[in-house]
UniProtKB/Swiss-Prot annotation:
It is found in: Cytoplasm, Cytoskeleton; Cell projection, Lamellipodium; Cell junction, Focal adhesion; Cell projection, Neuron projection. Ca(2+)-regulated actin-binding protein which plays an important role in actin bundling. May have a unique function in the morphogenesis of neuronal cells which form ganglia. Required for SREC1-mediated regulation of neurite-like outgrowth. Plays a role in regenerative sensory axon outgrowth and remodeling processes after peripheral injury in neonates. Involved in the formation of long fine actin-containing filopodia-like structures in fibroblast. Plays a role in ciliogenesis. PROSITE patterns: HP. A 1,2-diacyl-sn-glycero-3-phospho-(1D-myo-inositol-4,5-bisphosphate) binds at residues 109-116, 135-143. GO terms for molecular function: actin binding; actin filament binding; Arp2/3 complex binding. SUPFAM superfamilies: Actin depolymerizing proteins (SSF55753), C-terminal, gelsolin-like domain of Sec23/24 (SSF82754), VHP, Villin headpiece domain (SSF47050). This is Advillin. GO terms for cellular component: actin filament; axon; cell projection; cytoplasm; focal adhesion; lamellipodium; neuron projection. The keyword Phosphoprotein applies. Associates (via C-terminus) with actin. Interacts with F-actin. Interacts with SCARF1; the interaction occurs in embryonic dorsal root ganglions at 18 dpc and induces neurite-like outgrowth. Interacts with PLCE1. Interacts with ACTR2 and ACTR3; associates with the ARP2/3 complex.
C-alpha cells in the first residue's frame, strides 16, 4: 500500500484515526472497534484536535505485549513517515500495553479493551452485530479504565476489581466487594458501550454485587454454568500508581551521537528553565524514569530528528529502565503541554495576548492589564475565566483580622490596608440573578506567626460553614493578590511589608517609607511597600516616597498616564494628596539622600514582553492511602468532575481545587494541603504562594466554569448514578432465558466438530414441498438460525423471543416464513 493511500483518512478535522499493522502494511481500524487492541499487534493512533485557533496533533504507536520485533520496528517507521507527512509538527509517543500515557488513555473515555491474539492468529476487528463471543474481561481503573481478556475461570477473579463475562447476547458484570462505586460505574458504561457499539444494542446486561451474590441466583447460575463451580476469590490487588513526589524529580541531558556512540551529558536538574534548550541540538528529559521526553531543536539535522526515538530507547536501555517506559518526542516550537509544564516558566516572545504577563520588583518586565466589559462576565464565563474576574468588585465587603487567634472585624475606614505581620479574612458577596454568591479570601502576611496562619485557615472553615459551604475559598499569599481581590478595594489597596494594625500593638511609622504603585485602573492597582533604597526603583512604575515631613511621587519613564492617575488617588489616601511629583531623571538631591544615596536600579529600556505559554490542565487528586496521587484528565469536560472526587484545575497563575459533594471527609478536610502539596511537588518548581481557590460542587463561579466548554449547572441533578443505571437494566429474567436457550442449542451440536448445527436463512425458508435437512424440526426452524441470523430475521434476541407468549412467537414465525 502506498503512503498516500494509507494516510488518505488524515485531515485537519478533530478526530481519532487508528491503524493496525497487518503484514507490515497499515490497515484502518473501523470506528466501532476503536479502543480495542489485540495483544499480538502494533497500532498507530493519530489524534487531531483544536486548541483555540491552533491545530494540535499527536501520533502514538502502541506495542502489544505479544507483538513481534518486526511489527514494532514497522510501527516506528510508519510513525516517522506519518510525522513527515504532517510536516513534522506532531508530538510522537511510544505506548506499551498496560503502561500507556494518560494522554492516550484519555482518548478512549469508555476504556481500553485488550484482546488476545492478533493478525498472525487470524483475529480481525469485526463490525457491529457480532454475537459469537465468549470471553472474561478484567476491568481495572476508575477514570481511564482498561479491560483485559483473562482466562475463563474463577481463578482470574479478585475482590478489588470488576469483571465482565461477555457471552455475546449476554454480558454479566461481577463487582468485587472491595471495588468502589466509580469503578463499578465505569465498568457498567463499558458494558453498555460493548452492547451498543458491537451488538447493535441487542445484548442483555446483568449485574452481580460480589458481596451479595445470593441476591442474584439466576445470574450466579449462568456464571457457574460458564466458569464452573465458584471457588475462593483472591484478595484485592493494589494498583501500581506513581505518586506525585516520585514524579517531581527531573533531569535534562544533552544528546549527541559521536561516531555512532550515544553520548548523554547532564545539563540541569529541577527547576528547569526554557533557556537551557539550544535550538541546534537534541535533548532528553528524564522524569524519574517514569517517562522520557526527547526535544528536537529546529536547527537539528533531519537525521538527528528521525533518530530521536531510537536514541530515547538506547537511553532507557543505558539507564536500566523497564522497556515499557513511556516515550514522547516533541518538536521545537510545537511542544506538548506535558513537556512545557516541567519547566519553571515557558513563554513565547513577541506576543501581546494570552495568560498572565510577568511582573517582578526590580526588573523591567511589567504587567499590561487590558480593559474588559464587566457585563460579559456571567453571560460569557470564558471571559470571566480569562480575566480571573467574577464581577467588577462592587459587591458587599466584610473584613476581619486574626487577633489572639480569633476574628476581629476591621472598621470600614481601614478596609484595603494590609500589614505583613497579620492575617485577614475578606468575605465578598455579590448577586447573580437575585441569588447571593460568596468568595472568602484568606490573606496571609509574610511575617505572620505560624499560629496565626493556622488560625486563618481554621476560621475560614467556620465562616464557610455559616453559609452552608457556598463560599469559594481563596488563599492569598502576600504579594500574590489576584485581580478580583484588588478590584474589591477599588484602586486603594495598600500592603505594608511588616507590622500590625491591631490596637495597642501598632509600631511607630519609620522615618522613610517607599511604596511601589502598579496598575492602570481600579481593578488592578495596589501600593506595595518595598525597601527604602534606590535599588528598589523600576523605570516602568510609579513610586511614592513618604517621610514624616515631605512626600515625593516619582514617575518612571516607562509608566503610562493611566498608571500615574491611579497613583495620584493613592497619594490622596496615604499623604492627604500632598506629594511633589518627580520625573525620572529630574530628581532633587534630597530625593536620593532620603533613599540612602543614588545607586543603580532597573532603568533599561522595557524588556521584550513575554506571554506565558501554558495550557489549563485538570487532575484527579487523592491522598486516601497516605501517598499523594495525581492523575491527569486529558481533553477534559464537565463530565469528568465526578461528585465522589476532589479535582484540581491548574491555570498556572492560580489553582482551583474542586470538591465533589460525595468526596470523603478526609479529602474535604485536607483540601488546602492537597493543593499546596501539588505546588510543592510540581516538577517545574512552582511558586508555593500561587493563589489557591477551593470550590464546592454546585457553587462554581464563572472564573472556574469558563474553562469548561458549555457548562451545564444541572448536569449533576440530571446525570444518572451507578444505582440508577443499574436499575434501568431491569431484572435477570431475560438473561436467564437467553442463556437457557443457549444451553438448549447444544442439542444441535455436531458431535464430530463441536460446532452448533446452524443453517443459512434461505435453507430454512424453503416451502412445505421442498426438502429441509433431515435433522431440522419443521415446527422449530428458528432453533437452527445462528445468533446473528436470528436477530436479523426477528429483530430481537433469542432470549427476548423466548420470553414472548406462544401465540406471539407463532405469529412472528408465520410472518417471516418460518412456519
Amino acid at each position: 500500500m502506498s503512503l498516500s493511500s494509507a494516510f488518505r483518512a488524515v485531515s485537519n478535522d478533530p478526530r481519532i484515526i487508528t491503524w493496525r499493522i497487518e503484514k507490515m502494511e497499515l490497515a484502518l481500524v473501523p470506528l466501532s472497534a476503536h479502543g480495542n487492541f489485540y495483544e499480538g499487534d502494533c497500532y498507530i493512533v493519530l489524534s487531531t484536535r483544536r486548541v483555540g485557533s491552533l491545530l494540535s496533533q499527536n501520533i502514538h504507536f502502541w506495542i502489544g505485549k505479544d507483538s513481534s520485533q518486526d511489527e514494532q520496528s514497522c510501527a516506528a517507521i510508519y510513525t516517522t513517515q506519518l510525522d513527515d507527512y504532517l510536516g513534522g509538527s506532531p508530538v510522537q509517543h511510544r505506548e506499551v500495553q498496560y503502561h500507556e500515557s494518560d494522554t492516550f488513555r484519555g482518548y478512549f473515555k469508555q476504556g481500553i479493551i485488550y484482546k488476545k491474539g492478533g493478525v498472525a492468529s487470524g483475529m480481525k476487528h469485526v463490525e457491529t452485530n457480532t454475537y459469537d463471543v465468549k470471553r472474561l474481561l478484567h476491568v481495572k481503573g476508575k477514570r481511564n479504565i482498561q479491560a483485559t481478556e483473562v482466562e475463563m475461570s474463577w481463578d482470574s477473579f479478585n475482590r478489588g476489581d470488576v469483571f465482565l463475562l461477555d457471552l455475546g447476547m449476554v454480558i454479566i458484570q461481577w463487582n468485587g466487594p472491595e471495588s468502589n462505586s466509580g469503578e463499578r460505574l465505569k465498568a457498567m458504561l463499558l458494558a453498555k458501550d460493548i452492547r451498543d457499539r458491537e451488538r447493535g444494542g441487542r445484548a442483555e446486561i446483568g449485574v452481580i454485587e460480589g458481596d451479595k451474590e445470593a441476591a442474584s441466583p439466576g445470574l450466579m447460575t449462568v456464571l457457574q454454568d460458564t466458569l464452573g463451580r465458584r471457588s475462593m476469590i483472591k484478595p484485592a490487588v493494589s494498583d501500581e500508581i506513581m505518586d506525585q513526589q516520585q514524579k517531581s524529580s527531573i533531569m535534562l541531558y544533552h544528546v549527541s551521537d559521536t561516531a555512532g556512540q550515544l553520548s548523554v551529558t547532564e545539563v540541569a536538574t529541577r527547576p528547569l528553565v526554557q533557556d537551557l534548550l539550544n535550538h541546534d541540538d537534541c535533548y532528553i528529559l528524564d522524569q524519574s524514569g517514569t517517562k522520557i521526553y526527547v526535544w528536537k531543536g529546529k536547527g537539528a539535522t533531519k537525521v538527528e530528528k528521525q533518530a530521536a526515538m531510537s536514541k530515547a530507547l538506547d537511553f532507557i536501555k543505558m539507564k536500566g529502565y523497564p522497556s515499557s517506559t513511556n516515550v514522547e518526542t516533541v518538536n521545537d516550537g510545537a511542544e506538548s503541554a506535558m513537556f512545557k509544564q516541567l519547566f519553571q516558566k515557558w513563554s513565547v516572545k513577541d506576543q501581546t495576548t494570552g495568560l498572565g504577563k510577568i511582573f517582578s520588583t526590580g526588573k523591567i518586565a511589567k504587567i499590561f492589564q487590558d480593559k474588559f466589559d464587566v457585563s460579559l462576565l456571567h453571560t460569557k464565563p470564558e471571559v470571566a475565566a480569562q480575566e480571573r474576574m467574577v464581577d467588577d468588585g462592587k459587591g458587599q465587603v466584610e473584613v476581619w483580622r486574626i487577633e489572639n487567634l480569633e476574628l476581629v472585624p476591621v472598621e470600614y475606614q481601614w478596609h484595603g490596608f494590609f500589614y505583613g505581620g497579620d492575617c485577614y479574612l475578606v468575605l465578598y458577596t455579590y448577586d447573580v440573578n437575585g441569588k447571593p454568591h460568596y468568595i472568602l479570601y484568606i490573606w496571609q502576611g509574610r511575617h505572620a506567626s505560624r499560629d496565626e496562619l493556622a488560625a486563618s485557615a481554621y476560621r475560614a472553615v467556620e465562616v464557610d460553614q455559616q453559609f452552608d459551604g457556598a463560599p469559594v475559598q481563596v488563599r492569598v499569599s502576600m504579594g500574590k493578590e489576584p485581580r478580583h481581590f484588588m478590584a474589591i478595594f477599588k484602586g486603594k489597596l495598600v500592603i505594608y511589608e511588616g507590622g500590625t494594625s491591631r490596637k495597642g500593638n501598632e509600631e511607630p511609622d519609620p522615618p522613610v517609607r517607599l511604596f511601589q504603585i502598579h496598575g492602570n485602573d481600579k481593578s488592578n492597582t495596589k501600593a506595595v511597600e518595598v525597601s527604602a533604597s534606590a535599588s528598589s526603583l523600576n523605570s516602568n512604575d510609579v513610586f511614592l516616597l513618604r517621610t514624616q515631613a515631605e512626600h515625593y511621587l516619582w514617575y518612571g519613564k516607562g509608566s503610562s498616564g493611566d498608571e500615574r492617575a491611579m497613583a495620584k488617588e493613592l497619594v490622596d489616601l496615604l499623604c492627604d494628596g500632598n506629594a511633589d511629583t518627580v520625573a525620572e531623571g529630574q530628581e532633587p538631591p534630597e530625593f536620593w539622600d532620603l533613599l540612602g544615596g543614588k545607586t543603580a536600579y532597573a532603568n533599561d529600556k522595557r524588556l521584550q514582553q513575554e506571554t506565558l505559554d501554558v495550557q489549563v490542565r485538570l487532575f484527579e487528586c487523592s491522598n486516601k492511602t497516605g501517598r499523594f496521587l495525581v492523575t491527569e484528565v486529558t481533553d477534559f469536560t464537565q463530565e469528568d468532575l465526578s461528585p465522589g472526587d476532589v479535582m484540581l484545575l491548574d491555570t498556572w497563575d492560580q489553582v482551583f481545587l474542586w470538591i465533589g459533594a460525595e468526596a470523603n471527609a478526609t479529602e474535604k478536610k485536607g483540601a488546602l494541603s492537597t493543593a499546596q502539596e501539588y505546588l510543592v511537588t510540581h516538577p517545574s518548581g512552582r511558586d508555593p504562594d500561587t493563589p489557591i481557590l477551593i470550590i464546592k460542587q454546585g457553587f462554581e463561579p464563572p472564573t472556574f466554569t469558563g474553562w469548561f466548554l458549555a457548562w451545564d449547572p444541572h448536569i449533576w441533578s440530571e446525570g444518572k448514578s451507578y444505582e440508577q443505571l443499574k436499575n434501568e437494566l431491569g431484572d435477570a429474567t431475560a438473561i436467564v432465558r437467553i442463556t437457557a436457550d443457549m444451553k438448549n442449542a447444544t442439542l444441535y451440536l455436531n458431535p464430530s466438530d463441536g460446532e452448533p448445527k446452524y443453517y443459512p436463512v434461505e435453507v430454512l425458508l424453503k416451502g412445505q414441498n421442498q426438502e429441509l435437512p433431515e435433522d431440522v424440526d419443521p415446527a422449530k426452524k428458528e432453533n437452527y438460525l445462528s445468533e446473528q441470523d436470528f436477530v436479523s430475521v426477528f429483530g430481537i434476541t433469542r432470549g427476548q423471543f423466548t420470553a414472548l407468549p406462544g401465540w406471539k412467537q407463532l405469529q412472528l414465525k408465520k410472518e417471516r416464513g418460518l412456519f
